[in-house]
Amino acid sequence: MINSGRLSVPSWLVDSPLNTPDADSFAGQMVPGAPMDDAPVSGGQSPWLLRHFGNQFQLLVYANDASQLSAAQVQELAALAQGPVPIHTTVVAQSGQAPAPLATLIDVQGAVAQRYDLQPGSCYLLRPDQHVAARWRQFDAAKVRAALARATGNA
């Protein structure tokens, strides 16, 4: 019996019309349409990034200190979860805890920041199948909603 699951690799969907093309400059392989890269994290139920993503649209937001997000930022990010297609936010940070209702993961080795070319304020819209739908250097709720509409075929 052959375990073909070990031989499979995620598809790269870089030519999909559901992706939002980059408007900002990024290095690395985490382009729209790329499958997410895994990395070690702490602060959640699993020590691996990928275990915290999937089965829903999610926004990964990067911060140096998650506790330093402003009340306005938290309110805007939390509002994304109230839309017709909810987007749940997870803050990945070097330290700190984001205010509720946002989830926080700590980038213990800096691997998430390196693999995703993250700077404070960078954010990634991630699809339920753990592929990158869009990414920006700074959070903009209107751009996130437009990328969600495109990713769901409603643009």
What are these regions (language model features)?
Residues 1-155:
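Helical substrate-recognition/capping region of FAD-dependent monooxygenase/halogenase enzymes
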